[in-house]
Amino acid sequence: MLYGDVGCGKTHMAIATGMLACERGMPVRFFTASSLVMRLRRARDENRLDAELRAIGRARLLVIDELGYLPIDIDGARLLFQAGADSYETRSVISASNPESGRWGDVFGDGDMAAAVIDRIVHHGRILRFHGESYRNKHPLMK
């Protein structure tokens, strides 16, 4: 998990890691958390959720960006949890986020589900903390 302040390079690091994995021949899938939830909802509504989860599961690296930036309703949290649970102990997952750990219940709409997600992340994972001044604030294109 890449965790920290806005603009400190979490997404940049996630993309760079994904690109390096691709260069080494690994299949990689990249989603924002909200786009992944929308994709899974659409697949479920079209009765093809299992096929979508299998397609995502073919990646050896799953990158989920912006996890926690937007609240996810309980239905979306369950779908995201399902994708994450399918990845647990079978593939590498990079997630980039910035909410404080105490806010995960708000993000997932359910404290128990948040605890289960965090439990799986910390079991085999590493949390890399990014902090400092926002790169975008330091190097604005608008002056």
What positions do the PLM features span?
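Walker A/P-loop nucleotide-binding motif
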Residues: 1-13
